[in-house]
Amino acid sequence: MMKMKQQGLVADLLPNIRVMKFFGHFVFNYYDDNSSKYLHKIFCCVNLFLLLLQFALCAVNLIIESADVDDLTANTITLLFFTHSIVKIIYFAVRSKYFYRTWAIWNNPNSHPLFAESNARYHAIALKKMRLLLFLVGATTVLSAIAWTVLTFFEHPIRKLVDPVTNETTIIELPQLLLRSYYPFDASKGIMHVIVLIYQFYWVLFMLIDANSLDVLFCSWLLFACEQLQHLKQIMKPLMELSATLDTVVPNSSELFKAGSAEHLRESENQPPPPVPPQGDSMLDLDLRNIYSNRQDFTATFRPTAGMTFNGGVGPNGLTKKQEMLVRSAIKYWVERHKHIVRLVTAVGDAYGFALLLHMLTTTITLTLLAYQATKVNGVNVYAASTIGYIIYTFGQVFLFCIFGNRLIEESTSVMEAAYSCHWYDGSEEAKTFVQIVCQQCQKAMSISGAKFFTVSLDLFASVLGAVVTYFMVLVQLK
């Protein structure tokens, strides 16, 4: 069967999509062929059933051990910790159309021949960073699952029962497993112990990866948007220099049209002037069909005798009408690309905003209980290692999307600074108007909100960290 060639963000994020498919997310698009789609649906349903089964068994164990406050707190933290994964698997399955729409939003971006090199460079940078992010988070997740498993065998778990009548303490040995869980059979020895160990390792690994793969997808979208904003800031200066040719006689102005980036413009300043190319041989005789979204903008024909001729060109700058049109089209390219980025960020917020709200609600409760658990640490042991591991991992999840949300805010607001810093005063009147509009539009930063309740930024991370530290200090004082 013929393989389907992916494009846009789907092609860029294909490794992430494959990870999501392999670990049980309900991604039923983007197959190389349709033969495996049915099998993948069966796998996703079976995987979700196994994950929900172990989650329910842990909940039953929580109810059984609810008499002891410390056991109740520890079991609650475990359930809340893995609630992220269950929520995100179901959330993606229910709202998958929003994710597909976001993946497809960059399938047909506008382009411009003068800035193709800059666009390709920043796209390559974004692609490299997205792959690196996926690798780092994936490696951290696998190492966390391995560390969880190894830590299990450092200490034999026990449970203390206190008789309310005689006040006698009875110690019960528990199965040496990754999770405290109820099973209707003896899982402490024999083949059943091995089977349960394998099942729990599979459960921990899949749950961690299912949650983090969706977080990495969210961060990759924001990373891509930030690099596109970098691209727009980088071409602002050459855009103004190109625009200056429309109003002012510039010697060798045809050199400006060879610039694909600001670096090229700076490199060409000290070069000897090239000979004027014959009419019709200029590199500006390019296909402009991808610059505009409609044909009315570029299908207009110009009379060859229109305007004043100057050195074989049209107008006092020595530019042909087609060259002037190319300069003006560069401004429209910038505006349309910025609108495209805004649409991408809006789609990301629609797809993932409510999941962020659920994540922060669960994390707040988890960190509150972990602060209580931290007051019980009295030495270097398995309890201390597991508590510290929970805290670092939970804060790491919040920091991951907060750092990228904060960068989006910074990059979107710095566009205004880049527009003002370029030589807009040497540009054409329409370029000056363009800079004024850019400064007005970019005063409000692009951002991602958690269903309108909070903005994803480092301020959010700082507030969560500060609240947890304050609560911990209060508990220490009360203790």
Curated annotation (Swiss-Prot):
Q: How does it sit in the membrane?
A: Multi-pass membrane protein
Q: Which GO terms describe its cellular component?
A: plasma membrane
BP terms from Gene Ontology:
antennal development; detection of chemical stimulus involved in sensory perception of smell; detection of pheromone; mating behavior; olfactory behavior; response to pheromone; signal transduction; social behavior
Q: Which UniProt keywords apply?
A: Behavior, Cell membrane, Glycoprotein, Membrane, Olfaction, Receptor, Sensory transduction, Transducer, Transmembrane, Transmembrane helix
Task: Output one GO MF annotation.
Answer: odorant binding
Domain of life of the organism encoding this protein = Eukaryota
Q: Which residues are on the Extracellular side of the membrane?
A: 65-73, 155-190, 372-383, 477-479
Looking up InterPro entries in the UniProt record yields: 7tm6_olfct_rcpt
Localization, UniProt: Cell membrane
Q: Which Pfam families match?
A: 7tm_6
Disruption of the gene: reported phenotype: Impaired behavior and decreased reproductive performance, probably due to loss of pheromone sensing. Ants show strongly decreased sensitivity to various pure semiochemicals delivered in puffs of air, and display increased levels of wandering outside of the nest. In a solitary environment, homozygous mutants also display an abnormal antennal twitching behavior: they quickly move their antennae, similar to the quick antennal movement observed during dueling among workers in the transition to gamergates.
Instruction: Name the family the entry cites.
Output: Belongs to the insect chemoreceptor superfamily. Heteromeric odorant receptor channel (TC 1.A.69) family. Orco subfamily.
Q: What does this protein do?
A: Odorant coreceptor which complexes with conventional odorant receptors (ORs) to form odorant-sensing units, providing sensitive and prolonged odorant signaling and calcium permeability. Obligate coreceptor of all odorant receptors. Orco is a universal and integral part of the functional odorant receptor, involved in the dendritic localization of other olfactory receptors. Can form functional ion channels in the absence of an odor-binding odorant receptor. Plays a central role in the perception of olfactory stimuli in ants and is essential for ant social organization.
> How does this polypeptide assemble, per the annotation?
Heterodimer with conventional odorant receptors (ORs).
User: What's the protein here called?
Assistant: Odorant receptor coreceptor
Organism (species) = Harpegnathos saltator (Jerdon's jumping ant)
The protein's gene is named Orco
